[in-house]
Swiss-Prot record:
Taxonomic path: Viruses, Riboviria, Orthornavirae, Negarnaviricota, Haploviricotina
Gene designation: N
Name by which UniProt lists this protein: Nucleoprotein
UniProt-annotated stretches for the region Homomultimerization: 1-36, 373-391
Basic and acidic residues compositional bias, start-end: 433-464
Species: Rinderpest virus (strain RBOK)
Assembly: Homomultimer; forms the nucleocapsid. Binds to viral genomic RNA. N0 interacts (via Ncore) with the phosphoprotein (via N-terminus); this interaction allows P to chaperon N0 to avoid N polymerization before encapsidation. Interacts as N-RNA template with the phosphoprotein (via C-terminus); this interaction positions the polymerase on the template. Interacts with the phosphoprotein; this interaction leads to the formation of membraneless organelles that function as viral replication factories.
Binding of RNA, residues: K180, R195, Q202, Y260, N351
Record comment regarding domains: Ncore is globular and carries regions required for N self-assembly and RNA-binding. Ntail is an intrinsically disordered monomeric domain in the C-terminus.
Role: Forms the helical nucleocapsid (NC) in a ratio of 1 N per 6 ribonucleotides, protecting the genome from nucleases. The nucleocapsid (NC) has a helical structure with either 12.35 or 11.64 N per turn, approximately 20 nm in diameter, with a hollow central cavity approximately 5 nm in diameter. The encapsidated genomic RNA serves as template for transcription and replication; encapsidation by N is coupled to RNA synthesis. Forms the encapsidation complex with the phosphoprotein protein P. Before encapsidation, the newly synthesized free N protein, so-called N0, is chaperoned by P.
Family in the record: Belongs to the paramyxoviruses nucleocapsid family.
Interaction with the phosphoprotein, as annotated region: 477-505
Length: 525
C-alpha cells in the first residue's frame, strides 16, 4: 500500500510537470511583422517631450493601425530610462514581431518638429507621414482623443523634473490598464479610477493630466488583443525588479502598480490556498478532499517550477494556466469560498455561478467558520507557547468580538448566496405552515367573540383583531424562515415587541367596554 501511495504521488507530479525544452529541432518561430519604435536620438529633454507629445496624439487617433499603435506604446513605456534603445533590445525576445528602432531628432523643416536620424538621407517626409495624419477631404474636423482637460494644447517642456512628472502621469494610466485588460476589461473602469485617485493623493501623478476615456479605451483594447505588447510590459516589470539598489521614481511606481497586476486571473487558485488550506480547519481531513489536496500540492510545485513568470501566466496566455482553474479542484474551491465569504466582506461580491460549484461544500465552509469561532488551534498554540489559560482567555474574547461583529453588520455575504439555502428555507417554510394551521382556529374564534359582544361596532372590532393576528403570524413565519445567526438577536427582540403589541391589541377586543390604553411600558415589561 505504501508503494501505491508513493507511485500515486510521483504520477501526479509527472502529470502536472511542464514539458522540458529538449529535442533536435530549434525554436519555433512564427510569421513576424515589423514594429517601428521611435526612440530619442539625443539626450535633450526637448526632444523627449516633443516625442512624447506626438506619440500621445498618435495613440488618440481612432484610425491608427494596430502595429503602429503597438510601436507608439512601446516607445512611451521606455521613455523614462536613459537609453531606451538598449532597454528594448535587451528585454525583447518575441517570436511574433520584429522591432525596428528609429532614432528621432529635432527638426525645423518638418511639420511635426521631428525627423528620423539618418546618414546623408533626408527622412523629413517619412517623419511627417509617421507623426501626422491627413485631415478628411470633406472639411470636417477629425475626432481625436487627448486629455480630459481640453485646455492643454501640448506637453512639450524643457524642465527635466516637469517632464518626469508628466511622463509618470501618462505611464501610470497605461500600466493601470494592464491589471484588468485581460481578465475583466468590461468592468475595469471603477478599479482603474480608484488607483488613479490613490496616486493623485500620493502626489505621484498630476491630476490635471487625466487622459480622455476614449484614449484609455483604445489603449486597453490594444493591450487586451496584442500579446506582444503584454510580453514587453511583463519583461519590463521583471527587468525593473532585478535592478539592484535604488530605482528611479517611475520604476518604483511601476513596481507598485505591479501588485495589482501580479497573479491576475489566478484568483481561484490563490483564494483556495488562502481560505481552504491556510485556515487549517479540521474539515480538510474529509476523504472527499484527499484527491484535490494532492492536486493542489502538485499545482503549487508546478507554480514554483515556472519561476518568475508564474504570476503572469494568464497575462502571457500560457496554456498551462488551465491546470490552475477551479474546475480541477471543485469541492475544495467551493469549501474555500464558503470560508471566504464568512471571513471577509470583500468576498461577498464574487460570482459563484460556475457549473462545478457545489452548494453543499460551500455551506460546509460557512459552518466551519461559524462553529469554530473563538476556538484556538492546539497545534498552533503549542508552537507559539500559548498556555491553556491563555487559550481559554483568547476564546472568550474572540467569542465576544464575534458576537459584537455579527450584531453590528450583517454584511453582503449572505445576500449574495441566499439561493444556496434551499434546504433550510424549505424546512422553515414547512414548520411555519404548520403553525399557521394551528393558529387559524384561534384567530377565527377571537373574531366571532368580538362580533357577538359588540354588533354595532362589528367593522371596527374585526379589523384590528384580524390585522393583529395576521401580523403576528406573518412576523413569526418570516422570522422563523430567516435562520441566519447573524441577525438572531435582533430578530428575537423584534419578535418579543411585536408579540406584546399584538397581545395588547387582541385583549382590547375581547368584549371589554373600555378600551385598554396603549403604553410602551407594557411592551418593556
Amino acid at each position: 500500500m505504501a508503494s501505491l501511495l508513493k507511485s500515486l504521488a510521483l504520477f501526479k507530479r509527472a502529470k502536472d510537470k511542464p514539458p522540458l525544452a529538449a529535442g533536435s529541432g530549434g525554436a519555433i518561430r512564427g510569421i513576424k511583422h515589423v514594429i517601428v519604435v521611435p526612440i530619442p536620438g539625443d539626450s535633450s529633454i526637448t526632444t523627449r517631450s516633443r516625442l512624447l507629445d506626438r506619440l500621445v496624439k498618435m495613440v488618440g487617433d481612432p484610425d491608427i493601425s494596430g502595429p503602429k499603435l503597438t510601436g507608439a506604446l512601446i516607445s512611451i513605456l521606455s521613455l523614462f530610462v536613459e537609453s531606451p534603445g538598449q532597454l528594448i533590445q535587451r528585454i525583447t525576445d518575441d517570436p511574433d514581431i520584429s522591432i525596428k528602432l528609429v532614432e528621432v531628432v529635432q527638426s525645423d523643416k518638418t511639420q511635426s518638429g521631428l525627423t528620423f536620424a539618418s546618414r546623408g538621407t533626408s527622412m523629413d517626409d517619412e517623419a511627417d507621414r509617421y507623426f501626422t495624419y491627413e485631415e478628411p477631404n470633406d472639411g470636417e474636423e477629425r475626432q481625436s482623443y487627448w486629455f480630459e482637460n481640453r485646455d492643454i494644447q501640448d506637453i512639450e517642456i524643457q524642465d527635466p523634473e516637469g517632464f518626469n512628472m508628466i511622463l509618470a502621469t501618462i505611464l501610470a494610466q497605461i500600466w493601470i490598464l494592464l491589471a484588468k485588460a485581460v481578465t475583466a476589461p468590461d468592468t475595469a473602469a471603477e478599479s482603474e479610477l480608484r488607483r488613479w485617485v490613490k496616486y493623485t493623493q500620493q502626489r505621484r501623478v498630476i491630476g490635471e493630466f487625466r487622459l480622455d476615456k476614449g484614449w484609455l479605451d483604445t489603449v486597453r483594447n490594444r493591450v487586451a488583443e496584442d500579446l506582444s505588447l503584454r510580453r514587453f510590459m511583463v519583461a519590463l516589470i521583471l527587468d525593473i525588479k532585478r535592478t539592484p539598489g535604488n530605482k528611479p521614481r517611475i520604476a518604483e511606481m511601476i513596481c507598485d502598480i505591479d501588485t495589482y497586476i501580479v497573479e491576475a486571473g489566478l484568483a481561484s487558485f490563490i483564494l483556495t490556498i488562502k481560505f481552504g488550506i491556510e485556515t487549517m480547519y479540521p474539515a480538510l481531513g474529509l476523504h472527499e478532499f484527499a484527491g484535490e489536496l494532492s492536486t493542489i500540492e502538485s499545482l503549487m510545485n508546478l507554480y514554483q517550477q515556472m519561476g518568475e513568470l508564474a504570476p503572469y501566466m494568464v497575462i502571457l496566455e500560457n496554456s498551462i494556466q488551465n491546470k490552475f482553474s477551479a474546475g480541477a479542484y471543485p469541492l475544495l474551491w467551493s469549501y474555500a469560498m464558503g470560508i471566504g465569504v464568512e471571513l471577509e466582506n470583500s468576498m461577498g461580491g464574487l460570482n459563484f455561478g460556475r457549473s462545478y460549484f457545489d452548494p453543499a461544500y460551500f455551506r460546509l465552509g460557512q459552518e466551519m467558520v461559524r462553529r469554530s469561532a473563538g476556538k484556538v488551534s492546539s497545534n498552533l498554540a503549542s508552537e507559539l507557547g500559548i498556555t491553556e489559560e491563555e487559550a481559554r482567555l483568547v476564546s472568550e474574547i474572540a467569542a465576544y468580538t464575534s458576537d459584537d461583529r455579527n450584531n453590528r453588520t450583517s454584511g453582503p455575504k449572505q445576500a449574495q448566496v441566499s439561493f444556496l439555502r434551499t434546504d433550510q428555507g424549505s424546512e422553515a417554510q414547512h414548520s411555519a405552515s404548520k403553525k399557521d394551521e394551528a393558529r387559524a382556529p384561534q384567530v377565527k374564534k377571537e373574531t366571532r367573540t368580538s362580533s357577538k359582544s359588540d354588533k354595532h361596532k362589528e367593522g371596527t372590532d374585526k379589523e384590528p383583531v384580524s390585522s393583529s393576528a395576521m401580523t403576528l403570524i406573518d412576523v413569526d413565519t418570516t422570522l422563523e424562515a430567516d435562520t441566519d445567526p447573524l441577525e438572531s438577536k435582533k430578530s428575537a427582540e423584534a419578535l418579543l415587541r411585536l408579540q406584546a403589541m399584538a397581545g395588547i391589541l387582541g385583549d382590547s377586543t375581547l368584549g371589554n367596554d373600555s378600551l385598554r390604553a396603549y403604553n410602551d411600558k407594557d411592551i418593556l415589561n
